[in-house]
Regions:
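Bacterial Sec-dependent N-terminal signal peptides
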Residues: 1-57
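Extended soluble regions of mature proteins
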Residues: 49-306
Length: 306
């Protein structure tokens, strides 16, 4: 049965342990969502959980960019889906550091961050956008992975050092005027094909991908469920700034994977542990019984299977 959930923002119990300032911040975010046309509290549980805009403050300067790169990212919420969700993933690309994030979600974050009246209704992004952002040190491969949990929950952060074993082929094609070469690999449960540009000798790509002697301009999983294609590439020198955000929880990668599995397999219990209350409804708008709500599961198709 296709189900939806109504989140009664006014009755959200803010988790104990947050400071008074953080509680006020969460309350303002949730209350403002109630004022948005179309009732943002009603959303499709067969899709990813909606990412809510957050306030981004400038932190330390990590380095200078040489390029800004935008990819169109299409992915299937479940392997059975015929339709794709779509986002734009932006890279701020330097020679030693790369920052990767959802450009559309950043637009909503920026609108909230720079709003003159932060108690006014916020701009909420449409569609299922990637809740991840990354900072990757290209000299060591160490990557900071950040993930915003649903409904103004804490931001999870963990460190990762991904390794890629690419097989570079002799196959070539031109993408946006750049000659690229095909490489393949198995990474965390999925097989990938990557087209990289040796003429841009920076070992990077969307999200935390890299490890090739050139920038990845196109990346697809061979099962057809995830596909990044180049949308724009421009030379641009700018500070690559680490964002400062509130409500950060440090975890390990195994702890993060466990959280995501629990979120999708046992969402009611997971929301409750975050101090959130949600009220699932069926297609007819009737609230589910407690037993039915506990049986509710969210389809899960992460890009990293392992």
């Amino acid at each position: 049965m296709k189900r939806q959930v109504f989140t009664d923002m006014l009755l959200v119990r803010i988790a104990e342990g947050y400071s008074l300032a953080d509680r006020r911040y969460i309350t303002r975010v949730l209350l403002s969502l109630l004022l948005v046309a179309g009732n943002i509290g009603l959303f499709n549980l067969q899709a990813q959980q909606p990412a809510i805009p957050i306030i981004l403050q400038a932190g330390k300067n990590l380095g200078k960019s040489e390029y800004f790169v935008d990819y169109i990212y299409k992915y299937k919420p479940t392997p059975q889906d015929k339709d794709f969700n779509e986002d734009i993933i932006r890279l701020e690309l330097g020679t030693s550091i790369v920052k990767s994030y959802s450009y559309r979600l950043w637009q909503a974050d920026s609108a909230l961050t720079h709003a003159a009246n932060k108690s006014a209704p916020m701009r909420t992004p449409s569609g299922d956008l990637s809740p991840f952002w990354y900072y990757r040190d290209l000299t060591t491969g160490r990557t900071q992975v950040w993930y915003r949990t649903p409904l103004a929950g804490p931001i999870l952060r963990y460190m990762d050092t991904p390794t890629f074993t690419w097989s570079i082929t002799g196959q070539k094609k031109t993408i946006s005027g750049y000659e690229t070469q095909l490489a393949t690999c198995l990474f965390r449960g999925r097989n990938y094909e990557a087209w990289f540009a040796p003429s841009i000798p920076i070992s990077a790509g969307p999200n935390l991908f890299g490890g090739l002697p050139g920038l990845i301009l196109e990346l697809r999983s061979t099962d057809g469920e995830h596909h990044f294609t180049l949308d724009a590439l421009q030379k641009r020198s700018a500070d690559i700034v680490e964002w400062k955000v509130r409500l950060v929880k440090e975890v390990s990668r195994p702890q993060f994977r466990d959280y995501c599995q629990r979120l999708h397999k046992h969402p009611m219990q997971t929301f409750k542990s975050n101090g959130q209350r949600v009220y699932p409804q069926n297609e007819q708008g009737d609230f589910l019984s407690e037993a039915e709500a506990l049986d509710w599961q969210i389809p899960y198709n992460p890009i990293e299977r392992e």
